[in-house]
């Protein structure tokens, strides 16, 4: 019975996301309705904005950790065509920007000798720190535990390791290419 409930809830969440993610919801007052509906499903703070054609989902949700959630703090901005797999849980802090076409994955398949349907699935929680910016077309791979506060992930980067606070990374695989200047008091 619990599995049926989880299945129906996931199906409803995906269906609602498809509907509110269309261009129709890009006009006011429907844009406000999009954000209100998403707040019903996900913990989202004030200033939460999301573009069209997004997808927040939990593949293998029947086997995924029950406590895995997707949470958004204050002033999180998510552009169009973003896919966030929150099977392992994703926590997004204040003032984070996620640019268009970003893919965030929090699960992986452990390749075995038998049929694919029998392979194990591993989940990894992810935290995106305050004031981080994920550039367009970036991919965050499973196993990355944290994108640090004030970190910047460059466009088209493939992140396979933790990004430290204030670090600027880019490339495939992503590596440090710079450091954000220290925050000044009052900024």
Question: Across the structure, where does each feature detected by a protein language model lie?
Answer:
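Conserved SAM-binding loop
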Residues: 82, 111-113
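Metal-dependent phosphoesterase signature
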Residues: 62
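Conserved catalytic-core motifs of eukaryotic protein kinase domains, centered on the activation segment
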Residues: 115-116, 144, 180
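Terminal amphipathic alpha-helical/low-complexity segments used for targeting or macromolecular assembly
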Residues: 1-47, 95, 108-110, 131, ...
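Left-handed beta-helix
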Residues: 51-52, 57-58, 68, 73-74, ...
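A short acidic, glycine-rich active-site loop
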Residues: 116-126
